[in-house]
Curated annotation (Swiss-Prot):
Pfam families: CDP-OH_P_transf
Name this polypeptide is given: CDP-diacylglycerol--inositol 3-phosphatidyltransferase
EC assignment: 2.7.8.11
Transmembrane stretches, start-end: 6-26, 28-48, 74-94, 96-116, 140-160, 175-195
């Protein structure tokens, strides 16, 4: 059998499309909020399809999982950079959010790989119960991730407009009220990610040191 080209698997092609849409979004962010947000959300929406394609076509790969996570982290980080420019008084909060997001996911992924998991989304039964629900319940994972991204996207749009009025309240403002608790919960889960991964790494270090004695 000819060797398979992992880079041309359908889920990975979707991943490349996500990167292209994200870059287009970043290009338009300084001047064209609705164009930028449309491409940003389209990039995020495709995130739901690459996983389905991987399962349906049996094309799940470590490269694809890494590509997916890095695209998510980089896209969110670039949006937060723009938010820091638009809301300079909240710059520290955006910096902390970026740092927490990147650090928690990287350490969690690294600890999963060291422990032998094929993906950072594979949680064993002895793992943290909150993370177990987060990664084994697709509705919970989708709601938290989509709500978090939508919150930041609405915050970006809100700088330019309140949005269409719904009664006496702008749609973007209303959306921020709804998604803000979701974004806050996502940050709490990121803290749990970080603490759990740090404990896992410390336990692995302790086990390695015990073997050497």
């Amino acid at each position: 059998m000819p060797e398979e080209n992992i880079f041309l698997f359908v889920p990975n092609l979707i991943g490349y499309a996500r990167i292209v849409f994200a870059i287009i979004s970043f290009y338009f962010m300084p001047c064209c909020p609705f164009t930028a947000s449309s491409f940003y959300l389209l990039s995020g929406l495709l995130d739901a399809f690459d996983g389905h394609a991987a399962r349906a076509l049996n094309q799940g790969t470590r490269f694809g999982a890494m590509l997916d996570m890095l695209t998510d982290r980089c896209a969110t980080m670039c949006l937060l950079v723009n938010l820091a420019l638009l809301y300079p008084r909240a710059t520290l909060l955006f910096q902390l959010s970026m740092s927490l997001d990147v650090a928690s996911h990287w350490l969690h992924l690294h600890s999963s790989v060291v422990r032998g998991s094929e993906s950072h989304k594979m949680i064993d039964l002895s793992g943290n119960p909150v993370l177990r629900i987060y990664y084994t319940s697709r509705p919970a994972l989708f709601t938290l991730c989509a709500g978090n991204e939508l919150f930041y996207c609405l915050l970006y749009l809100f700088n330019f407009s309140e949005g269409p009025l719904v009664g006496s309240v702008g749609l973007f403002r209303m959306g921020l009220w709804v998604t803000a608790p979701i974004a806050l919960l996502k940050s709490v889960i990121s803290v749990i990610h970080l603490i759990t991964a740090a404990r896992n790494m410390a336990a692995l270090d302790a086990a390695d040191r015990a073997k050497k004695k």
